[in-house]
Regions:
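Short, Lys/Arg-enriched N-terminal segments with co-localized hydrophobic residues
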Residues: 1-10
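Intrinsically disordered, low-complexity segments enriched in small residues
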Residues: 10-103, 107-615
Length: 615
């Protein structure tokens, strides 16, 4: 029996009060109201989706019909709040076996909300390919046999021709259909013509296992949610916009994100010797400038689109006009410039952009893809696979991408399982730069000590978006800390993981945290929903959401033994002679568990779970 959130949200503004539960095995759809108590405790998005997962998916195989995929919005989604444009897919990851939430910008979140839903929960599995259409508070299941096998972009074009230019696509490519364990979910719309991605954790494989090609959202602006406190919200909105516009990071036309996109970080992180290169055997890339945001702007940049209600416009659309890398697509973000650049020794921005284009076209997580190719290259150097793969060989990497998408040959099937599984099968798990089988992003913890604790304790594996310690270590937000010091990093990580859990459950872009304070989020939420909360409430909600996710992992056997880092970071020095100190790492874990009220083995005592209202 599925435990659905059923009690009506009668007094909280910002909800459509409708979550569609789809039994794909039986082709049945039920509509459930949103429980007010759950909404107050877990908000929406990542938090409410996580609640659904904890109640229904413990012990379920990630690629079985019993697993579910919850596609969720938050109470501010679709409103005038700047950067409240995200959508999130929540499930149990087929890549890691752990909690998974994968976020996407653009317009998919607002479109789902304006189609009349707070979320759609997919259960069971269809025997034949289908897609779902959300419109005016109703959901229909449609035949997708004509879409199955198409790339993400071709599938979107088919949907657009059938439903019109305003149709919003959120779906998978051949990688998801073929159950590649790091397949993503791609989004296309008039606000995301080049594409956006729910990239991490293999959510696209879960959608593919259910034989769902895509969700289609047909929005109605008449459904746009309005604030409970009109005048209070107007002031809160003005304050937030002023801060975003005045920030050196987010300011339109002047902030680094606006002028150069996320690629502005490439040179900065490289100079810190924190830019993992050639599978993190090195920490500085000699060709970093050529894959930087500065060089991208001067070479292949075509336009700088923005997501719905976002003044920052950090996105880059690119075009390579001729040659073997000819294409037009959403440009590579910082993480992709690194993962398909430095991590595999490739310093050619046109080639990096082309590999990114292939990933978007076929539906792959670019971070996991780059790490997986890095594992393959190092394994080739070690003579463990027959394929001859050299660092920086763009043509060979493009060939491998196509093979793994369709699981062609032994090498394609091996790499489709992800970098950690591939390394383990080859007998060298130590060459996978991963935590809980999720590969690292573009920050080497040897040069950014806070990121080591972030990766190790993250509920979804090595992830920079659980608690972006770089924010403190590089940007001084919310306060400055020394990148090479271990002191104070536990407090930084806990502060950010709670803030990010709250922001993710509102479904706001986390780039807003570079400019906005906790007070801003509290006032925006309070004036819009009509529910008065304090900064202490924000902290408690974030702690509850975070701990709920860790509890889900605990129920699947995760504990301190999984809060680890690849041994390369402990044993092999960076370009500046830095390693990650094991004793300092263990001390930080002890402090982290103590401040969270966990047991020393990283498990959560029942008392803590009850105190937070999780049990």
């Amino acid at each position: 029996m599925l435990h659905c959130i059923q009690t009506i949200v009668a007094m909280i503004n910002g909800y459509m009060n409708k979550i569609a539960w789809v039994d794909l095995s039986e082709k049945k759809i039920e509509y459930h109201e949103v429980d007010e108590d759950e909404a107050l405790k877990f908000i929406g998005g990542r938090g409410l989706g996580g609640r659904i997962l904890v109640k229904n998916c413990v012990g379920k195989d990630p690629l079985s019909p019993e697993n579910l995929l919850a596609v969720m919005t938050g109470p501010l989604t679709g409103s005038d709040v700047p950067m409240a444009n995200r959508i999130v897919a929540v499930t149990r990851s087929p890549l890691t076996g752990a909690f998974a939430d994968s976020h996407c910008g653009g317009y998919a979140g607002p479109a789902l909300k304006l189609a009349g839903f707070d979320g759609i929960v997919l259960t069971g599995a269809s025997e034949e390919p289908v897609y779902l259409v959300a419109k005016n508070g109703e959901l229909s299941i449609e035949d997708a046999k004509g879409l199955w096998g198409k790339t993400t972009f071709d599938a979107y074009q088919s949907i657009r021709r059938k439903y019109g230019a305003t149709a919003v696509f959120y779906g998978i490519g051949p990688a998801g259909e073929n159950l590649v364990r790091f397949a993503n979910i791609m989004h296309f719309s008039r606000f995301a013509t080049g594409g956006r991605a729910s990239g991490r954790c293999g959510t696209g494989a879960v959608m593919g296992s259910k034989k769902v090609k895509c969700l289609v959202f047909l929005a109605d602006m008449k459904r746009k949610p309005k604030p409970a406190d009109k005048e209070g919200f107007k002031k809160a909105l003005a304050d937030a916009l002023t801060k975003i516009k005045e920030s050196d990071i987010t300011g339109p036309g002047k902030g680094g994100l606006s002028v150069y996109g996320t690629g502005v970080l490439v040179n900065t992180i490289n100079e810190l010797a924190a830019f993992p290169t050639r599978n993190a055997k090195e920490t500085q890339f000699e060709d970093a400038y050529y894959i930087s945001g500065e060089n991208l702007k001067g070479t292949i940049l075509k336009k700088t689109p923005t997501c719905y209600k976002c003044p920052v416009a950090c996105k880059r659309d690119v075009e390579v006009k001729e040659g073997k890398f000819k294409h037009k697509s959403e440009g590579p973000e910082y993480e992709t410039l690194w993962s398909l650049g430095a991590m595999i020794g490739l310093g050619h921005v046109e080639a990096v952009a082309y590999l990114n284009y292939l990933a978007n076209l076929y539906g792959l997580d670019t971070i996991e893809l780059g790490n997986t190719l890095a594992v393959a290259t190092e394994a080739s150097e070690m003579g463990l696979i027959e394929e001859k793969i050299r660092w920086g060989d763009a043509d060979k990497y493009a060939e491998l991408v196509r093979k793994l998408i369709y699981r062609e040959e032994e090498i394609g099937d091996l790499l489709a399982e992800g970098g950690a599984a591939a390394a383990e099968k080859l007998g060298v798990p130590e060459i996978s730069m991963s935590v809980k089988k999720l590969s690292i992003p573009a920050y080497d913890p040897r040069g950014l000590k806070g990121m080591g604790l972030t990766y190790a304790t993250s509920n979804r594996g090595a992830c920079h978006l659980r608690a972006y310690a770089v924010s403190s270590e590089v940007f001084g937000v919310p306060y400055k800390t020394d990148p090479l010091s271990y002191d104070g990093k536990v407090d930084v990580v806990i502060t950010l993981e709670r803030l990010f859990a709250f922001v993710d459950s509102l479904n706001l872009c986390k780039f807003s945290t570079f400019a906005l304070s906790k007070e801003n989020y509290v006032v925006l939420y309070s004036t819009f929903t009509g529910v008065e909360i304090t900064e202490d409430d924000l902290e408690k909600i974030g702690e509850r959401i975070w701990t709920q996710e860790r509890y889900f992992n605990q129920l699947h056997g995760f504990s301190r033994k999984d809060d680890v880092l690849p041994k390369r970071f402990f044993e092999e020095p960076s370009a500046k002679g830095e390693v990650y100190d094991r004793d300092a790492f263990e001390r930080m874990l002890d402090e982290y568990y103590e401040k969270h009220k966990y047991n020393s083995d990283g498990t959560i005592p029942e008392e803590t779970l009850r105190e937070l209202g999780i049990l």
